[in-house]
Regions:
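N-terminal cap/lid segment of alpha/beta-hydrolase-fold proteins
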Residues: 25-52
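C-terminal catalytic histidine-bearing segment of alpha/beta-hydrolase fold enzymes
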Residues: 43-46, 105, 114, 240-282
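Short beta-strand element of the alpha/beta-hydrolase
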Residues: 55-64
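Alpha/beta-hydrolase active-site loop
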Residues: 106-155, 268-270
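Primarily recognizes the serine-hydrolase "nucleophile elbow" in alpha/beta-hydrolase
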Residues: 137-209
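The feature captures the conserved acid-bearing segment of alpha/beta-hydrolase catalytic domains
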Residues: 190-247
Length: 282
């Protein structure tokens, strides 16, 4: 009897770790890497391919205030979730700000969701500096290079060239938005999702703007107002946009257990439904 219990526990553990061991992973340095970059800081992509691909690919831009990357929550866990839905996941390591924090820096004013006009052109960057703005520019180059590389490998990775888009978290959302605004045809995403990540620069919506999905929480200072402003910029330009503002005030926006106690935990399933509605997946 004890042996049977032990084998059952062992089988359960194997099942728990199976998705991690079967997930394909490849790494590629991006052409935006320079000789001056430290090895650990060079921009690159990590590729997670599903066992049963449906042709869609998502470039994951993790958050981290442009100073670190929330890799485990925003890439590794998210890639596993996307792979379960047949979607290829591409984790992006982009350039980060290595400059010391300015001395005596004050907290920015807290802007409520009801005042999106506080962010003209949806620029919700709390503090523009020369070094900070240059890093956003470099990170956007990394993101565009990632989309280009996915398209170049599309046949090999069983990806449709017209079903490649961004999902950005926090600062990674700002990177994805910046990349989208300046992309050429090979770099342009087919869809853009930002998860509590407003624009970090003035928004100029491109003529061929992809459909935009925005997810945020009503009581998130500055972020919610900045994302409402982003939605308005997209709509004023005649582009397709959808905005989800969750009001229950719970949860970070990583993958969350489906407890039924909060609406924020449904963001990932709602994103999958949105991708279906946009004909990116079946």
């Amino acid at each position: 009897m004890e042996y049977r219990k032990y084998t059952k526990k062992l089988a359960l553990l194997c099942m728990l770790f199976l998705p991690l061991t079967t997930m394909a992973q490849k790494q590629y340095y991006l052409p935006t890497a320079s000789a001056s970059d430290d090895e650990k800081d060079k921009p690159m992509i990590e590729v997670y391919l599903p066992q049963h691909p449906n042709g869609c690919a998502v470039v994951l831009c993790p958050g981290g205030a442009m100073r670190w990357l929330s890799w485990e929550s925003d890439v590794v866990k998210m890639a596993s979730f996307l792979n379960e839905h047949g979607i290829a996941a591409i984790g992006l390591r982009y350039h980060l700000n290595k400059a010391p924090m300015p001395q005596g820096m004050k907290m920015p004013p807290m802007v409520d969701v009801t005042h999106p006009e506080a962010f003209p052109q949806a620029d919700a960057n709390p503090m523009h500096t020369a070094s900070g703005d240059s890093i956003i520019f470099l990170a956007a180059l990394d993101a565009k290079a990632a989309i280009r590389m996915v398209r170049e490998h599309a046949d090999e990775w069983k990806i449709s060239k017209d079903k490649i888009g961004f999902l950005g978290f926090s600062a990674g959302g700002g990177v994805a938005i910046a990349a989208t605004m300046s992309a050429d045809s090979m770099e342009r995403p087919d869809f853009l999702c930002t998860n509590f990540g407003p624009s970090l620069m003035p928004v100029n919506v491109p003529q061929d703007a992809p459909p935009l999905l925005i997810m945020t929480r009503a009581d998130h200072p500055n972020v919610a107002a900045g994302l409402v402003a982003l939605f308005m910029e997209w709509k004023k330009a005649g582009a397709n946009a959808e905005l989800h503002i969750y009001g229950d005030g719970k949860g970070p926006y990583e993958l969350m257990p489906q407890t039924g106690e909060t609406t924020t935990e449904t963001w990932s399933s709602q994103m999958i439904q949105w991708l279906k509605a946009k004909a990116m997946i079946e």
